[in-house]
């Protein structure tokens, strides 16, 4: 049986909720949204369909995703434009589209369906493939370099911090031992090294034993959390007053950054005991979601990748007194 095209296999997560949250901000004459993680263009396609006067600027660091999404969205003509960059360069993307402020920014974080499904990219532990994991194939650092050239101490730190794996010391030691004879070149070789380090009793408790190691390596290779820490404040600063920022994350490290940045903007900055809250002390953001919203049971059944999604959204309330900062 012939496999469906990649764009047809991708099902956007929490799509209806994203559109409903964006809708109040798009009630303007010529609204513009930045899709900061374009991927296969699923969310953008739905936005352009639902809001006929909307323009969307899609951002992605993955040239393959930009090419596929561009073909899929070609029929929308000048209502869609794409830019090859990382999503911390949101202001530059807006400027390239000819706007200073936008009405909404959407983040669908983490690894994309395209990257997981394309075996040769090396993101998935379930396929044997070259150790790569680069979201941008033109980037220099790959998982091969990290696995084979980083010291045991550095590997341990990455797997513990980015993978939140308590067996990080054992896994790092096993990787260094395995590469002593010859470099680890494939995902299967890496999986074997991880399996040898994780106790048998623990291998069946939290899914695949290599899941957290692969997450850690992917984050390291693509500097995902560093980029995200810059991107959320940049997004808040790029939306107009009344504009909205929506972020979907897929693991606790991403969600923690989003939560903290949104909470910081939603707090008063008035000094404790200050008798009057001055305008410059008032919150910049209003949180629109109660905690992190999750996909319902039906969506999770239809789209298993939605199971780990956590959605948070904010609205910008006022201008900031210090340019370039929403805090």
From Swiss-Prot:
GO terms (BP aspect): rRNA base methylation
Enzyme Commission identifier(s): 2.1.1.199
Name listed for the protein in its UniProt record: Ribosomal RNA small subunit methyltransferase H
Residues that hold S-adenosyl-L-methionine according to the record: 41-43, 60, 87, 108, 115
A Pfam family hit: Methyltransf_5
GO cellular component, one term: cytoplasm
Record's keyword annotation contains S-adenosyl-L-methionine: yes
């Amino acid at each position: 049986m012939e496999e469906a095209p990649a764009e047809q296999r991708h099902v956007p997560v929490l799509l209806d909720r994203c559109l409903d949250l964006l809708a109040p901000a798009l009630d303007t004459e010529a609204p513009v949204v930045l899709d900061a993680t374009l991927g296969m263009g699923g969310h953008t396609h739905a936005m352009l369909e639902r809001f006929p006067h909307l323009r969307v600027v899609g951002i992605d660091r993955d040239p393959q995703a930009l090419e596929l999404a561009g073909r899929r969205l070609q029929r929308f003509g000048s209502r869609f434009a794409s830019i090859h960059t990382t999503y911390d360069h949101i202001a530059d993307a807006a400027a390239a589209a000819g706007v200073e402020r936008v009405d909404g920014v959407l983040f669908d974080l983490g690894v994309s369906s395209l990257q997981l499904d394309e075996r040769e990219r090396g993101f998935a532990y379930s396929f044997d493939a070259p150790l790569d994991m680069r979201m941008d194939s033109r980037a220099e650092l790959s998982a091969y370099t990290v696995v084979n050239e980083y010291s045991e101490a550095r590997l341990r730190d990455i797997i513990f911090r980015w993978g939140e794996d308590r067996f990080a010391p054992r896994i790092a030691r096993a990787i260094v031992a395995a590469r002593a004879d010859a470099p680890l070149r494939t995902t299967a070789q890496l999986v074997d090294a991880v399996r040898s380090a994780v106790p048998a009793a623990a291998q069946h408790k939290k899914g695949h034993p290599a899941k957290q190691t692969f997450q850690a390596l992917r984050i390291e290779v693509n500097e995902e959390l560093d980029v995200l820490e810059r991107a959320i404040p940049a997004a808040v600063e790029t939306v107009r007053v009344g504009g909205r920022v929506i972020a979907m994350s897929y693991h606790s490290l991403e969600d923690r950054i989003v939560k903290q940045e949104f909470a910081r903007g939603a707090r008063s900055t008035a000094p404790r005991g200050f008798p009057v809250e001055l305008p410059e002390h008032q919150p910049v953001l209003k949180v629109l979601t109660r905690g992190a919203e999750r996909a319902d049971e039906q969506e999770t059944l239809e789209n298993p990748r939605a199971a780990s999604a956590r959605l948070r959204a904010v609205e910008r309330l006022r201008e900031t007194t210090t340019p370039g900062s929403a805090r």
